[in-house]
Amino acid sequence: MPMQTTRRDLLTRSAAAAAVAALPPLRTAFSQTTPADEGPGATDLQRDLEEAIARHRVVGASAAVYHRGEIETATAGILNATTGVDVTPETVMHIGSITKTLNTTLVMQLVDEGLVDLDAPVLDYLPDFAVADPEATRAIKVGMLLNHTSGIDGEMIPDHGPDQEAIRKAVERARDLGQLFAPGEDCSYCNTAMVVAGHVAERVLGDSWYSLIEDRVFGRLGLQHSVVQPQDALLHRASVGHFLDPATGTQQRTSQAFLPLSFAPAGSTAMMSAPDLLAFVAAHLRGGEGLNGERLLSEESSKAMRTGTAAVQGIGAVRSFGLGFMLGPNDDFGHGGGGPGILSWFSAHEESDFAMVVLTNSAHGGLVAFELVNAWMKKASGFEPLAPQRFPALDIDIDARLYAGVYEDVAAEHTITERDGRLSVSSRAKVAFYDTTSTDPTPAFPLDPVGEHSFVVSLPEAIAATAPQTLLSFVNPQDDGRMRHVSTGGRLYLRRSG
């Protein structure tokens, strides 16, 4: 499986690449398969977690494993570098874009109840909905919001201040957003689409999205350590994000607790304990039935969420999306989540009746999450869902004319240039979402071909030795042969010039 997962391949590779690091987290990942052994009980979760956060210098983490009805939990580190308070199993931590799976579950409940049709236009439920293109406005269907095929150029938008951060306000602002492609034509991870889906639920049921998640998801599953309203975090043992200063080696607490609140359905506010999130994931493993015996949604709808509906173009990206979930090649499913100084992940496999959640409060916490998920899934299922595949550079001729140009979306820009027959890429974020995000362009990193129309970013050796590869695939040739999009990290960026 992500995005970036989660968001930010080039961006998280070095301080120089911080511009792209602000993008939502999807992780380039592949799967490696070996025979399964007797199960994850052969490994000590507490030991693994403690060793991993020490090795990768992560402030704090919470992990939970479900396997054939048995649950194990572990915590390590502290929830706030300023206070020094320990992480416990009850600690609520940011889940970021994992929220999209909660949001999709809510919409699928409405499908179960006959209140929403995935094949119906969004306009049927939101008559005032609009994007910049009138034809796209009419063509976007509810299901496209959930599997990232709407084409909306809506990665993220700036914070408009507390008075303007209602969910409905973000939907109103969508009327200024263009299209990366026509609705249903392709697939590109989209935050705004998920916000629109959450607003559909609000309008259909006449209640706030926050209350609906609390009642219909947390309430049905009996979750006691989960919040979606930011102020409710004060009622819990709550974690906060951190960034590791590469110059000093010190942990810097984030200056912002949440991303723009109007993007709550996409992942800006939700916080959960690892055991609570595991209970939600386990409900999907059990065909929509919670561990408490309550039904979260129908077996049909739960299965639909885990069934592929949209393929991602290019190599080294998310393979495909179901509805809400990211899908791997071994019938595994999962999702990542990023935010201000946090990175979290879960993976699950129905055949093995296995799921694992790892929540961290460090921007580079994916190093811990991916390491543990790979090790424990391999024990239970015989494969590593997040094991990166490394592509060797190929000595092949390229036609630079096909690729050179500026590719962008509303949040980031990638400039591809050619010199002496070799391509390079420089990226920049358009909005400084995090403390460490710079809106200055990164240095130009060389691109080495690894396949037809696909390239690997050639990073400094010290970074490349340990970091996953950042891969760019140029897709959708135009009439003149030049590529219309570049695909990376589960996202498409549209050629604007060149």
Question: Which residues does each PLM region occupy?
Answer:
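A short acidic/small-residue loop/turn micro-motif
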Residues: I78-A81, A363-H364, R491
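Catalytic tyrosine of NAD(P)H-dependent dehydrogenase/reductases that use a Tyr as the general acid/base
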Residues: M93-G96, C187-Y189
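Short, conserved catalytic-motif segment at the N-terminal edge
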Residues: A36-I95, L115-D117, D124, A130-A132, ...
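N-terminal export signals
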Residues: P2-Q4, D9-S31
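Short, well-ordered beta-strand elements
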Residues: W345-S362, S487
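Peripheral terminal and inter-domain segments
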Residues: P329-N330, F370-G498
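Short, surface-exposed loop or secondary-structure junction motifs
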Residues: H67-A76, N80-A81, D133-F346
